[in-house]
Amino acid sequence: LWSDGDVPTTSEKFAAFDVGALRAQAVRVAGEAATLVADARAAGLTDVTTKSTETDVVTGSDRAAERLIRQRLGEWWPGVPVIGEEEGGSAPGGGLSWVVDPIDGTVNYLYGYPWYGVSVAAQVDGVSVAGAIVEPASGRVWEAARGQGASLAGQR
């Protein structure tokens, strides 16, 4: 993207990406993962463990959703880092990366409360430029892209 010797600013890097397309990809993959976790919740949870404390839980659905998201993003953006709550990761050197919380609100998910979502964001040099949150229980979708505003269920 950049000629030899040029050191682009973060703003120039933002301009190199179609943030609307990044937003659409975040919506799509978060929607796929939301369907996966809702179906798993309806089938009943069997794989639940704790992380750092008794109230910091992770389910098999968290892991499965993160794997799905990583797989899809890897197909669309080979080699681009994905930083996830369950599997971790890092984005050395900046540039484009994805940040994922496969089930934001796992305790609510575990106890059958509808207040949880799948969160996916694209970042450039650590600054969020596009993202989506899908709430499986209601089907609501929050989405945003830098310079294009934000919406909930299509309403700004």
Model feature map: region roles:
Residues 92-151:
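DPxDG-like acidic metal-binding loop motif
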Residues 155-156:
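Conserved beta-loop-beta connector loops within the AMP-binding
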Residues 2-103:
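N-terminal subdomain of lithium-sensitive/metallo-dependent phosphomonoesterases centered on the IMPase/IPPase/PAP
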